[in-house]
């Protein structure tokens, strides 16, 4: 199974792009959750507007699906400026970056998603652009080559990354604002589901929204995806209204349990417990047993299971925790004996 095929994937899926756009809040007052980030940005944006300056360069980092792209667009709206969006892999050469920078107006926001994937030559050109608002490029070849100085208007670079540790120190140090996007609380996710249902013109009860929220892995993108699937179920199997019972039936049909675990998550944990006494068990052995590539297990399944406390990584392999045993109604001490 690929990341794009998985219902509980936090990665953006191409088919969802237009729907995600319709669900995005436009301003900080509409943005649900991430209170610390919002409070800080409110101050920084207001101060920059009072001084009639561009906002400091801003780095947004955290797991996928938490609203980094949306926050970049909100920043541009709050500053009342245009935004140009691109991604690290899309800027292959220094010339690509020059073309983008030359289109910016004073105060504009340049949003670079997956900024940790910028080629080194492009990243190094960004240093002077971010710090002093100019770039130097070499024109000509051989003995006729000479640098050409291009001044740039003051602008705000908003970078987004799921892997802040992969950013080089020189690039990271040039961001004046660094904000960590965290997993959402269930109450905030419930409010997001209610808001999205209203946009979809779908009638939903609070307990139905909460049932979706608590199975959404703390991630708005997953919550909205599950809402769409539950909406389909409600329209075909019921009267179109989503209450707790309908949400539970739909999500159970989709094999998403109350902790947000899907079929493969459950299979992985049960394999560790039933076949290997809870571990330790090696990653390659686990992968063979559940029929997935080792990279898929490590990148797609393990992070959430570790974050929620279902498994632990040790030098000898993976171990199922008491929480994992309890989730399936197993006795931990008895299971470890076996």
Swiss-Prot record:
Keywords: ATP-binding, Cytoplasm, DNA damage, DNA recombination, DNA repair, DNA-binding, Hydrolase, Nucleotide-binding. Residues 258-338 are annotated as: Head domain (RuvB-H). GO terms for biological process: DNA recombination; DNA repair. It comes from the Bacteria. Its EC number is 3.6.4.-. InterPro entries: AAA+_ATPase (IPR003593), AAA_lid_4 (IPR041445), DNA_helicase_Holl-junc_RuvB (IPR004605), P-loop_NTPase (IPR027417), RuvB-like_N (IPR008824), RuvB_C (IPR008823), WH-like_DNA-bd_sf (IPR036388), WH_DNA-bd_sf (IPR036390). Its main location: cytoplasm. The keyword Cytoplasm applies. Mg(2+) binds at residue 69. It catalyses: ATP + H2O = ADP + phosphate + H(+). GO terms for molecular function: ATP binding; ATP hydrolysis activity; four-way junction DNA binding; four-way junction helicase activity. It is an enzyme of class 3 (hydrolase). Residues 1-184 are annotated as: Large ATPase domain (RuvB-L). Residues 185-255 are annotated as: Small ATPAse domain (RuvB-S). Homohexamer. Forms an RuvA(8)-RuvB(12)-Holliday junction (HJ) complex. HJ DNA is sandwiched between 2 RuvA tetramers; dsDNA enters through RuvA and exits via RuvB. An RuvB hexamer assembles on each DNA strand where it exits the tetramer. Each RuvB hexamer is contacted by two RuvA subunits (via domain III) on 2 adjacent RuvB subunits; this complex drives branch migration. In the full resolvosome a probable DNA-RuvA(4)-RuvB(12)-RuvC(2) complex forms which resolves the HJ. This is Holliday junction branch migration complex subunit RuvB. The gene is ruvB.
